[in-house]
């Protein structure tokens, strides 16, 4: 009936705590095309006059750049065709600075009462991320991480980070700077996200040919080919908003 309208529901009601009733980007949650280009920070923080989060998601606007040069020349009967294609791809969006952290976490070299009183193994560097038994009220360190390399509480390298999770009661818990904010679902975009780093690919192409008889020629070529990333590499802010409910 006409008396019902989707605008009766706030964005968070339509997102339904992670069991989303709508899917959108480039439009607002009620299906109206956006006239602005909201940032990722806007998605997590921007509110309307009634205090409802707008949850606006910008359209996906990757930047593709490509160039090609080619030259053909001959040396006696040997004909060369040489070229170079350069492709540059910029997803033009934010990505996590550390793919394992949605909230800022302490590293070994930072000074807190908890870390100052901790017994840190000699194999652990100052830049290693600290994992604890309880993110809200840590009492013991259960592991460390250096990029993709994980260590247990004794500083021994481990191949399975689930061992760190088991030591924390079944869930990996980094030593968070703001555990209260993380528990409330706050995401500090400026602290944990960064701009996507554009990728540049160089693709040489070399071909040559020469006659091997009056009626036949020999041809050979070498080239490097790449494929542009698919649309599926678009960042999905809703996934991060409800990550705790979806894992």
Regions found by a protein language model. Give the residues of each.
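Structural signature of Gram-negative outer-membrane beta-barrels, strongest in the C-terminal barrel
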Residues: 2-12, 16-17, 30, 58-247
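Short loop/turn hinge sites at secondary-structure boundaries
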Residues: 9, 17-18, 38, 46
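Polybasic, low-complexity Lys/Arg-rich tracts in intrinsically disordered regions
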Residues: 14, 18-20, 49, 53-54
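N-terminal, post-signal-peptide metal-ligating segments of extracellular/periplasmic oxidoreductases
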Residues: 24
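Conserved oxyanion/phosphate-binding beta-strand-loop segments in alpha/beta enzyme cores
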Residues: 28-39
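Short glycine/proline-rich turn/loop motifs
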Residues: 40-55, 182-190
């Amino acid at each position: 009936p006409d008396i019902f309208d989707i605008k009766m529901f706030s964005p968070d009601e339509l997102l339904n705590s992670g069991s989303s009733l709508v899917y959108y980007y480039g439009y607002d949650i009620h299906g109206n095309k956006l006239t602005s280009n909201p940032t990722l920070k806007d998605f997590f923080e921007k509110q309307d006059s009634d205090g409802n989060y707008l949850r606006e998601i910008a359209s996906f606007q990757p930047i593709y750049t490509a160039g090609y040069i080619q030259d053909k020349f001959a040396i006696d009967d040997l004909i060369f065709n040489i070229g170079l294609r350069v492709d540059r791809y910029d997803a033009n969006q934010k990505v996590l600075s550390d793919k394992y952290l949605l909230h800022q976490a302490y590293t070994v070299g930072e000074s807190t009462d908890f870390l100052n009183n901790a017994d840190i193994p000699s194999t652990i560097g100052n830049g290693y991320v600290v994992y604890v038994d309880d993110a809200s009220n840590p009492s013991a360190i259960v592991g460390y991480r250096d990029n993709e390399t994980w260590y247990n509480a004794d500083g021994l390298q481990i191949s399975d980070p689930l061992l760190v999770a088991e030591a924390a009661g079944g869930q990996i818990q980094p030593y968070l700077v703001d555990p209260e904010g993380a528990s409330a679902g706050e995401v500090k975009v400026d602290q944990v996200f960064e701009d996507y780093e554009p990728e540049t690919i160089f693709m040489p192409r070399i071909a040559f040919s020469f006659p091997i008889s009056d009626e036949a020629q020999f041809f050979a070529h070498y080239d490097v080919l790449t494929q542009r990333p698919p649309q599926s590499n678009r960042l999905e802010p809703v996934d991060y908003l409800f990550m705790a409910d979806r894992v």
